[in-house]
Regions:
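Flavin (primarily FAD) binding-site architecture
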Residues: 315-336
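Mobile amphipathic helical/loop "lid" adjacent to a hydrophobic cofactor/ligand pocket
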Residues: 2-5, 11-18, 125-234
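Glycine-rich FAD pyrophosphate-binding loop
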Residues: 67-91
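Core beta-strand elements of the Rossmann-like FAD/NAD(P) dinucleotide-binding domain
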Residues: 46-48, 305-314
């Protein structure tokens, strides 16, 4: 498929800041669907086989799999676009990933979707070897220094390996099966609970005497870069899981986490899944926030804030943990799940992009402490005369509000390297009412107590979100895992018509 088959329509989401125009709301994306509602006449009040709430990757995969099996399915989405916390904006010919971004062959479900829709080779890379400003800047508060990428990489690797080596085997003993972290045949659950008691700060305090000042600064910044929260609260067990998922090697961190992107943007893949589902019969309604879910007498009623009610035999709810308190469930959620939701998650990240003049494609950098922690030169913008810059921070609540003080993003970016900034772009996930945060990272003592409950069903409502995936929690891969599993469950219960006759329909042969 060519990107020209899609038109980038305006979304109400996303922000652009320039000194000339100030703050402007709304960005164009392939993820905006027109018309915004498609429900066949006379079918609005019927009982659907399934309703899928949320059009992120979990919801898209679930909806596609359900309609592909012939199930009458309605997709209900609060936003004006598909993608949830993963979407790409098209600005002046350049694609900007506003949320989830990178892909890897380690992400099996995601890669299979890329293969399915002809995108397996349609990738670009964030890092440009030999690009302009081909070095790493490190600013730990006493001025910026230039390091080679190898020097910075070696320091980061040494710090990470000391930090993560809790079991003396780089995580292999405590997490041999990262998709079954909390219960498998090789690890005593009590040992896992012991690790889950640790915050990342606890672990840093245990090993910081083994690190140089620069190594400590790099570790203090990469931890919130990974999890989006404060090291004082972030659970260390999640870091062990991340280590296992990247094959127990810091050497693969870039390849798995921050290197390969879909050339056309994540919204191009999301759009392919959505279009496939619509071709197969999916019906949908956008700008339809849900306010209540009622499960009674085998039928689930979903009511929107506009007082529209839709009914189905099963519901796949893909809302993130941060948004579950906004929904009234009847019957109420279990006390244990409510307890987990009250504690909630920690990823209050800031992610922004900038278009800067000249060639900064080779730039990498870290500032600690800083309003932004990491920066990546991210290829040329359209036209080849300016560079796309991507930057991340952890929990900046109370310190940096990019909507109220967007000029502070420019100031923070200048700490990495002198830049002539043409524009800054971002999605403010913390103020987004349908996200309220980034992809989940949990505090200590959370996963071993609450993960299984978050994954469990609530009557005829299946809960499916990357926030409680078994493997790649918080990743696109985890969202696809959850959506596919939920769809399979619905099909097994609502009925999946296969190629073989139902039991009892075989005719016995007169001769054997």
């Amino acid at each position: 498929m060519s990107p020209s088959i899609y038109r980038a329509n305006p979304s109400s989401e996303g922000y652009t800041y320039t000194k000339k125009d100030g703050l402007v709301t709304g960005l164009n994306t392939y993820g905006v669907i027109q018309p915004e509602r498609k429900i066949r006449h006379g079918e609005e009040n019927k009982v659907w086989d399934a309703i899928v709430i949320g059009a992120g990757y979990a919801g898209l995969v679930a909806a596609r799999d359900l309609v592909k099996a012939g199930k009458k399915t309605l997709l209900v989405e609060a936003r004006d676009r598909i993608g949830g916390r993963t979407w790409s904006a098209e600005v002046d010919g350049t694609t900007y990933e506003m949320g989830g971004t990178w892909v890897s062959h380690n992400h099996g479900r995601l890669f299979s979707e890329m293969q399915r829709y002809g995108l397996k080779d349609d990738v670009s890379v964030t890092r440009t070897e030999g690009g302009g400003c081909d070095y790493f800047t490190l600013d730990t508060g006493s001025g910026s220094r230039k390091l080679t990428h190898k020097e910075a990489g070696d320091m980061t690797a040494n710090a990470w390996n000391i930090f993560i080596n809790w079991d003396g085997k780089m995580g292999r003993d405590i997490c041999p099966l990262p998709h079954s972290t909390l219960g498998n045949i090789r690890v005593n659950p009590e040992k896992v609970k012991e690790v889950d008691k640790l915050t990342c700060r606890d672990r840093i305090e245990q090993i910081k005497h083994l690190l140089s000042a620069d190594e400590l600064a790099l570790l203090e910044s990469i931890v919130p870069h990974i999890g989006g929260g404060a090291v004082e609260d972030m659970g260390f067990l999640g870091m062990i899981c991340a280590q296992a998922l990247q094959n127990y090697e810091i050497a693969t961190f870039e390849e798995v986490w921050t290197l390969y992107k879909i050339r056309e943007g994540q919204s191009a893949l999301a759009r392919r899944i959505f279009d496939d589902a619509v071709r197969l019969g999916l019906q949908y309604t956008f700008k339809s926030p849900v306010k209540s879910i009622t499960d009674k007498d085998g039928i689930v009623s979903v009511e929107t804030t506009a007082s529209k009610t839709y009914r189905a035999r099963r519901v796949v709810n893909t809302l993130p943990i941060t948004c579950l308190p906004d929904i009234r469930f009847d019957p109420p959620l279990s006390p244990l799940r409510q307890e987990a939701i009250k504690i909630n998650q920690l990823d209050y990240l800031t992610k922004c992009h900038a278009e800067v003049e000249g060639d900064l494609r080779g730039l990498r950098g870290c500032t600690w402490p800083g309003d932004l922690l990491y920066v990546y030169g991210d290829g040329f913008c359209a036209g080849g005369k300016s560079t796309r810059i991507t930057s991340f921070a952890g929990d900046n609540r109370g310190k940096l509000d990019p909507i109220k003080e967007p000029e502070k993003l420019e100031t923070a970016l200048q700490r990495f390297h002198p830049m002539k900034i043409k524009k800054v772009l971002w999605h403010d996930w913390v103020s987004d009412p349908y996200a309220k945060a980034g992809a989940a990272w949990y505090p200590a003592n959370f996963l071993t107590k609450y993960l299984a409950e978050l994954q469990s069903r609530h009557g005829n409502v299946l809960m499916a979100n990357a926030d409680w995936a078994s493997g790649w929690r918080g990743f696109i891969e985890g969202a696809m895992e959850q959506g596919a599993i939920a769809a399979d469950t619905v099909l097994n219960e609502v009925g999946n018509v296969g190629a073989n006759p139902a039991p009892g329909e075989y005719q016995r042969s007169s001769r054997i």
